[in-house]
Amino acid sequence: MLDLGLSKMALIGVVALVVLGPERLPRVARTAGALFGRAQRYINDVKAEVSREIELDALRTMKTDFEQAARNVENTIHDNLREHERDLNAAWNSAVSPGGSAAADAPDGPSAASGEPSWRSIAAAPAKRRNWRVKKAVTPVWYKRATMRRTQVQSGAARVARHRPASLRRPARFL
């Protein structure tokens, strides 16, 4: 950048002392130092931001590569599962049907002309239908206790009457 040695800096200081004088030199030196420090901080911030952008760009490319690899793995797994499911359906249909080999030649899957259910539909138990509104509306008791939430609301007068000692209670009159 600039080749400033000790001798050149001393020469600049002497010239500044002669030109500015001893009264204004400290103030100008402070201002110059502050401006120089500000410029250094700005340059360091720009360098840091550029390096951050370079790292972010590298991370983005790594992210896209990773997502692509994950998609490829997912697709191969799904293809293998579909192939094994087709084999299982074919074996199931051949074992269930009385003809044996005639069902193995038929197309498999939900569009099968034989109307035979697949192994997956037979094995799956019908799901119980529940009222989801009731399930979502219920707050667990442990949560109510932990948050000190009242389960039964009582008026102030009823609470005072409930906790008043028997000696201070008024006798109840009937008729």
UniProtKB/Swiss-Prot annotation:
The protein's matches in Gene3D superfamilies, at most eight in alphabetical order, are given as: 1.20.5.3310
Q: What keywords are annotated for this sequence in UniProt?
A: Cell inner membrane, Cell membrane, Membrane, Protein transport, Translocation, Transmembrane, Transmembrane helix, Transport
- Location of this chain's protein in the cell: Cell inner membrane
The record's Gene Ontology biological-process terms are:
protein transport by the Tat complex
- Region labeled Disordered — which residues? 96-119, 152-175
Q: How does it sit in the membrane?
A: Single-pass membrane protein
Q: What is its main location?
A: membrane
Extent of Low complexity compositional bias = 96-115
**Extent of the signal sequence:** none
A GO cellular component annotation here is: TAT protein transport complex
Task: Note the InterPro entries from the entry.
Answer: TatA/B/E (IPR003369), TatB (IPR018448)
- Report biased composition (Basic residues) as residue ranges: 160-175
As for family, the record states:
Belongs to the TatB family.
Question: Could you describe the subunit structure of this protein?
Answer: The Tat system comprises two distinct complexes: a TatABC complex, containing multiple copies of TatA, TatB and TatC subunits, and a separate TatA complex, containing only TatA subunits. Substrates initially bind to the TatABC complex, which probably triggers association of the separate TatA complex to form the active translocon.
Question: Which NCBIfam families does the UniProt entry name for this protein?
Answer: tatB (TIGR01410)
State its role. Answer: Part of the twin-arginine translocation (Tat) system that transports large folded proteins containing a characteristic twin-arginine motif in their signal peptide across membranes. Together with TatC, TatB is part of a receptor directly interacting with Tat signal peptides. TatB may form an oligomeric binding site that transiently accommodates folded Tat precursor proteins before their translocation.
Q: What is this protein called?
A: Sec-independent protein translocase protein TatB
Q: Which organism is it from?
A: Burkholderia pseudomallei (strain 1710b)
